[in-house]
Regions:
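C-terminal helix/juxtamembrane-tail motif
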Residues: 70, 83-84, 89-101, 383-410, ...
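ATP/nucleoside-binding phosphotransfer catalytic cores, i.e., glycine-rich phosphate-binding loops
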Residues: 262-276, 285, 293-417, 423, ...
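Short hydrophobic beta-strand segments
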Residues: 57-64, 352-354
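Terminal signal-anchor or tail-anchor transmembrane helices
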Residues: 15, 424-446
Length: 446
C-alpha cells in the first residue's frame, strides 16, 4: 500500500502519507465544504462582535478621591493610567467646578452609548448625579464601592469583590463589565424641611433611606469626628470605620437619648397618622432594602400588628417608601449582626414628619441636626442605574467556590510563612482598631 512500510522494513523507513487528515476532524471538514461556521469560527465571531460592542461603548468614571481613606486617591491615579480616550476619568470632588467652567469632559456625552462608573460611597452617587443634572440627564451609573455602607451598590449587585484590581484597572474588562450590565431605575425622593415658625424651605434629595433618631445620632457623631483634621488618620480602613460607628452608637446605648421617640415625632403616611411601638428610638424610611452595610430591613422585618397581607415587597423603583422602627443602639447592633429584626410600620408614597424637638436626621449617610418643624417627603424622579446581571453574579459565585475548592496551603514551609504573615497583619489591624476605638471614645465622651 502506497505510503505504508513493507513488512519487516526498518523503523526509519516509516513514512506518513501527505493526505492523512486525522488532525482535521471530518465534521469540521464537512462544515468548511458546506460554508457553515465551525464552533471555533462561531466563538471567534462572537468575540469579534463583543469587541465591536465594547468599542462603541464610551465610559466615564467619577472617582471620589476622599473615599476609602487612601484608596480613593490610588484608584483615581491608576484609572487615569489604565483608561485611554474616548474613555474619561474625573475627580468627583472637582466635578461641580469643572461643570461651572464648561469643561467638555464633564459636560458632553452621548446618552445612547455612554455608561458611567462612580467610585465612592452612596453619598458620592448623589453628589455626582445632582451635578450632572445641571447639564443634562446622566448616563446609566454603576458603582465601585469605596464608602462605609455601600448599600445602593449592594442592591445593584456591585459588591466589594466585583471590582477587584484585575477588573477595575483593565480597560477591556472594565468596559465589557459595564456594557453587559442591565439598565434599570432607582427612585429619587425629595425632602423639604421647614423650621417651626419660618416660611423658608430647605430641599434635599435621597435615594437610599432617611433616618431619624438613634441611627442618625451615630452617623452625626461619626461625621463630626471624620471632618476633624486631628483624627483623619482614624478613617483609613473600612474595619476602623465600622468600629467607630459602633463606638458612637454605644453612647445612646448607655444614655437612651431617644427614649419615647414616638412622643417627639408624628408621622403621617399618605395622609394617615401611623403609630410606633412605645420603645421606638429610631425611625427609618427605606427606598432600598439594604441599610447600614447590607441589613435587609424590610424583607426580614417583624410584621407587627398589621399582618402579612397589608404590605407588598420592597422595590427600589416602585414609587413607594417603607417605614420601619428600631428600639435603640443595641437593636441596631443586633441588626448588623443579623440576630434581630426591625418592626414594619407602614408603606406609602407620601410621608410627612412633624418633629416636636430638635433631632438628628440623616439621608444616605449624610447627617445633620434638624430643628423642630416638619419634613415632607415625596417622589422626585428616577435615576438610571446599571445592575450586575444575575448570570454574572452566578459566575462570580462559582469562580469564588472553585478558587476556594482548588486552593491549598502549599508546602509546609510556605504554609507556615503564610500563616505567620496573616498573623502579623491581623495583629497590626487589631492594634490599629483598638487605638482608633480608644481615641474616638476619649474624644466623644470627654
Amino acid at each position: 500500500m502506497d505510503g505504508y512500510p513493507a513488512r519487516g522494513a526498518p523503523r526509519a523507513s516509516v513514512r506518513v502519507s501527505t493526505t492523512t487528515t486525522t488532525s482535521f476532524p471530518s465534521r469540521r471538514r464537512r462544515c468548511v465544504r458546506a460554508g457553515r461556521p465551525t464552533v471555533f469560527a462561531r466563538e471567534a465571531s462572537s468575540r469579534d462582535a463583543e469587541d465591536a460592542e465594547d468599542a462603541a461603548c464610551d465610559v466615564v468614571v467619577f472617582v471620589n478621591a476622599k473615599s476609602g481613606g487612601r484608596r480613593g486617591k490610588e484608584v483615581l491615579r491608576r484609572l487615569r493610567r489604565a483608561l485611554k480616550p474616548p474613555h474619561r476619568v474625573l475627580d468627583a470632588t472637582k466635578l461641580a467646578a469643572a461643570i461651572d467652567r464648561g469643561d467638555p469632559e464633564a459636560t458632553t456625552w452621548d446618552a445612547r452609548s455612554t455608561r458611567a462608573l462612580v467610585a465612592g460611597g452612596d453619598g458620592t452617587v448623589g453628589h455626582v448625579t445632582d451635578a450632572l443634572r445641571r447639564v443634562r440627564t446622566p448616563p446609566p451609573i454603576a458603582i465601585a464601592p469605596l464608602g462605609t455602607g455601600n448599600d445602593l451598590a449592594r442592591v445593584l449587585g456591585w459588591n466589594d469583590d466585583v471590582w477587584n484590581d484585575e477588573r477595575l484597572f483593565d480597560e477591556r474588562r472594565l468596559v465589557s463589565t459595564l456594557r453587559r450590565a442591565d439598565v434599570g431605575g432607582v427612585d429619587r425622593w425629595k425632602l423639604e424641611a421647614r423650621r417651626r415658625g419660618r416660611a423658608e424651605t430647605t430641599t434635599r434629595v435621597f435615594t437610599n433611606y432617611l433616618g431619624i433618631g438613634v441611627d442618625a445620632r451615630a452617623a452625626l457623631a461619626f461625621d463630626t469626628v471624620r471632618k476633624d483634621a486631628r483624627f483623619s488618620w482614624l478613617f483609613a480602613h473600612a474595619a476602623t470605620n465600622k468600629l467607630l460607628y459602633a463606638v458612637f452608637g454605644a453612647r445612646d446605648f448607655l444614655q437612651h437619648s431617644f427614649a419615647r421617640l414616638d412622643e417627639d415625632v408624628v408621622v403621617a403616611v399618605d395622609d394617615r397618622v401611623v403609630e410606633f411601638p412605645r420603645d421606638t428610638e429610631g425611625i427609618i424610611l427605606l427606598n432600598i432594602n439594604s441599610f447600614s452595610g447590607g441589613v435587609r430591613m424590610w424583607s426580614s422585618a417583624d410584621r407587627g400588628a398589621r399582618g402579612d397581607a397589608t404590605f407588598s415587597k420592597s422595590r427600589a423603583d416602585d414609587g413607594a417608601l417603607e417605614i420601619v422602627a428600631v428600639t435603640g443602639a443595641l437593636h441596631l447592633g443586633q441588626l448588623n449582626a443579623r440576630v434581630a429584626k426591625p418592626v414594619q410600620v407602614a408603606q406609602g408614597r407620601r410621608v410627612r414628619v412633624e418633629l416636636k424637638r430638635d433631632l438628628p436626621v440623616q439621608i444616605d449617610g449624610e447627617p445633620w441636626l434638624q430643628r423642630a418643624g416638619t419634613l415632607d417627603v415625596s417622589f422626585l424622579d428616577s435615576l438610571a442605574v446599571l445592575r450586575r446581571p444575575r448570570r454574572d453574579r452566578l459566575n462570580d459565585l462559582l469562580d469564588k467556590w472553585f478558587q476556594f475548592a482548588s486552593s491549598d496551603g502549599g508546602d509546609e514551609d510556605g504554609g507556615a510563612k503564610t500563616s505567620l504573615s496573616r498573623f502579623r497583619r491581623a495583629a497590626l489591624v487589631a492594634c490599629f482598631v483598638v487605638a482608633a476605638a480608644f481615641a474616638a471614645w476619649k474624644t466623644w465622651f470627654a
